[in-house]
């Protein structure tokens, strides 16, 4: 793409000149400033917020990343790094006065070390690809966001991603050992260590979840875990959200640590069942999915205890997965919930906050009241075990006033910042 493909007049910078300068650093084919070619980069998964990129740069090496960042730093040009664009908090939304740096070519799995139980990968490697590469050695990478088939490990580090199994196995910060990054001044930095308990300040915890504000991740070393010998999912359906909330607290208080403990409300249940036919009871007001893993006897005992608890606490249907296929089908419904909601609403606004487990029912009840107040549907799909909520506020951007009501319905995110709420006060270069 040539530097003069399209005049840039949206702001005060001469973007044709900047694109030409960047083409001296990166292959001209991968410095994009044509409007139609840059349009796919105007937003991430939170499509309600968009900004057309001035220039998109797709480097092929760490040296090129360093040179691009040095160039931008010297000219105070903001840089927004993009992984797969699956995020739901506008973290990859372009800055109106900056460029987009896409890590799409950093896709090499550099090393799988089964003896040390680590994987060393470039930042553009897909989350699920790490587990796929480790599977022949009986190992897996634990954090599993719903978008794991597409999201990248660099984006996971930026967002400190979790997933349905984070209750037992932790978030990205608990599973990353070392990160190679480039600062906004173009300097290479290594944070962390392959050792499980490295010396010095824990800068890795500072970096993980910093959403690109501290540098551009180019390489990540993660720890791998042995695949559990056995795993079963207990699916429990309730006719009342309060009962389901009480069940969550009771499971944890019994000393049971599930691999995953997820909850869905009726709107999410119906949408997911219609989408993937997981066998969910669509008449349920709330659905719990509780996975137990470990050795065969331990899993059998825990699954029986959880099943008995669910009946005791008022579930009207309880099923325990009997095969690996059935277990995966139960989870497929949960992990497909977000795209399933997309089939019943033109747009949705995903929020992300954490509350005490004991207040789940109270918060869900308040959401239903707000749903009536703002005349917008809300679907709830969330990590019940640690109280991490993901309410999806459904709206149609083509209907005047609905997006504004959705914004008023929502709130500032607590586990991930909203890029459009911070761009005005944070310097990226």
Describe the role of every protein-language-model region.
Residues 1-70, 87-117, 146, 266-277, ...:
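N-terminal flexible segment immediately upstream of the FAD-binding catalytic core
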Residues 32-42, 222-226, 232-409:
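C-terminal substrate-recognition/cap domain of FAD-linked oxidoreductases
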Residues 76-78, 89:
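Glycine-rich active-site/cofactor-binding loop and its immediate structural neighborhood
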Residues 108-264:
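FAD-binding subdomain of flavoenzyme oxidoreductases
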Residues 415-422:
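Conserved small/polar residues in nucleotide/adenosyl-binding loops
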Residues 426-429:
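Hydrophobic alpha-helical segments, chiefly the membrane-spanning helices
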